[in-house]
């Protein structure tokens, strides 16, 4: 799965789909899209805010980009969580483990370990063949079932 296909899949086909599995490529391509877009919005908001700060206030343009950034984050909360749950499913793990790790990440020092656990889970390949969460997203027969 390439960049465009991953973004299209997450935003159009599986926006709030918590069932099934997400391959590593789907996950990492979408995360790249998310990080690049968030960085671009933040960078432009920072630039417009920096130049308006010289005049003693925040410009309307900086405010617009801050609002766009906020809306972007709110709009992608659900697909990001569903993508993470489906990535856990690909490892044959319940999505509830993600909730447990998010809660643990709020505890000082434990949060670092919980974040590393999520990172390692996302880096490891999914289980081969079908598992209790669905068919293998990397196998052609699995794709044929999904797009049939």
Language-model segments: what does each one mean?
Residues 1-33, 80-97, 120-148:
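Membrane-interface extramembranous regions at the lipid-water interface
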Residues 1-6, 10, 52-55, 59, ...:
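Coil-to-alpha-helix initiation sites in intrinsically disordered, low-complexity, charged segments
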Residues 50-60, 130-131, 142-144:
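Short, surface-exposed, charge-dense and proline/glycine-enriched linear segments
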Residues 26-53, 61-84, 94-123:
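Hydrophobic alpha-helical transmembrane segments in multi-pass membrane proteins
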């Amino acid at each position: 799965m390439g960049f465009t296909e991953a973004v299209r899949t997450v935003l159009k086909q599986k926006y709030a789909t918590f069932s099934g599995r997400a391959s590593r490529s789907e996950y990492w391509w979408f995360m790249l899209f998310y990080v690049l877009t968030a960085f671009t919005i933040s960078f432009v908001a920072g630039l417009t805010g920096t130049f308006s700060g010289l005049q003693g206030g925040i410009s309307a343009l900086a405010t617009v980009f801050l609002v766009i950034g906020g809306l972007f984050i709110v709009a992608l909360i659900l697909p990001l969580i569903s993508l993470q749950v489906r990535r856990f499913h690909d490892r044959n793990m319940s999505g509830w483990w993600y909730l447990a790790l998010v809660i643990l990440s709020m505890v000082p020092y434990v949060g670092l370990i919980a974040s590393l656990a999520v990172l390692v889970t996302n880096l490891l390949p999914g289980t081969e063949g079908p598992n209790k969460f669905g068919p293998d997203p990397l196998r052609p027969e699995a794709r044929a079932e999904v797009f049939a």
